[in-house]
Amino acid sequence: MQDPRISLNKLGEYMTAPTPSRRKRIVSDQQAPQTFIAARYKDAREAIVDFIVSGMSDRSGLLSLASRLRKSRDGSEFAINDRIASADAIESFIQAVDDIDLGNCIAVSMPGTTSQGMKIAGVYVSVRPDIYLRNWVTGEIEGALKLHFPKTSPLTSAGAEYVATAMRVYMELEQGNSHVDHRRCYVVDVPTASVTVAPKAYVRKMKDIEVACEEIAIRWFSGSAAA
C-alpha cells in the first residue's frame, strides 16, 4: 500500500470539515485520486500565475483571456466545460487582486512537475506553492502564494489559515528560508475571491495539523477511509 499522502489544500479542507463522513471521503479521494479532477482549472491556473509573475498589471488582458476561454468550443464536452470553469475562476480571481501585495518582491513560478512537500506525523503533505515571492534586491524568498479553485469545496478562512501556516513552515524549516514574512504567505480561495495570510503565531496550528495527520494515517491504513 502506498504511504499516506494528502495535498495541502485538501489538508486545509480536512482541518475544518464539518462531519466525520466528509473527512473520511477526503482521505478516500486522496488514496485514489481521479485524473480528470487533477486536470481541472489548468487554463485558469496558468493564466493567473502568468498574471502574477508579470506584475499583476494587465487585468484587461486577463479578462480578455477569460472571454476567449468561455467562447471556445474546441475539444470534448469536458474540455469545453473546464474552459468555462477556468473563465469563471479568472473573473473571480480579479476581484481578489487588490488584496495581494507583492511589496519589494518579484513573483517566481515553479514547474508544475516539481515535487515539493514534507512529512507530518507520517503523512506526506504535498505543498507545491504556485508562486514564490523573492526579494528583488537580496534574492531571499520572503513568501509564497497558493491557489485553491474548486467551487464545490471552497476553503474557509480557518482552513486557509492552516494552509498558509503549513506553507510558511515548509519554507522556513524544510527549505531553510530565514527571511519568510508571514504577511507574504498567501492563500487565495478563487471561487470566493478570498485572500488569507498566515497568522504570526503558528505553533498551535501546526500541532493541530500534526494531530490531523495522525488521524489521516490511521484512516489510511485501517481501511476506514474507503468510500
What residue spans do the PLM features occupy?
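Nucleic-acid nuclease catalytic cores
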Residues: 135-201
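Well-ordered, non-membrane alpha-helical segments in soluble/globular domains
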Residues: 86-89, 160-170, 203-213
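Short N-terminal helix-initiation segments at or just after the protein's N-terminus
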Residues: 68-79, 126-132, 207-211
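Active-site metal-binding core of divalent-cation-utilizing nuclease and nuclease-like domains
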Residues: 106-136
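Domain-level recognition of nuclease-like catalytic cores that cleave nucleotide substrates
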Residues: 182-227
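Metal-dependent nuclease catalytic cores that hydrolyze phosphodiester bonds in DNA/RNA
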Residues: 1-107
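Short, charged/polar micro-motifs that form catalytic or ligand-binding hotspots
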Residues: 34-38, 76, 80-83, 117-122, ...
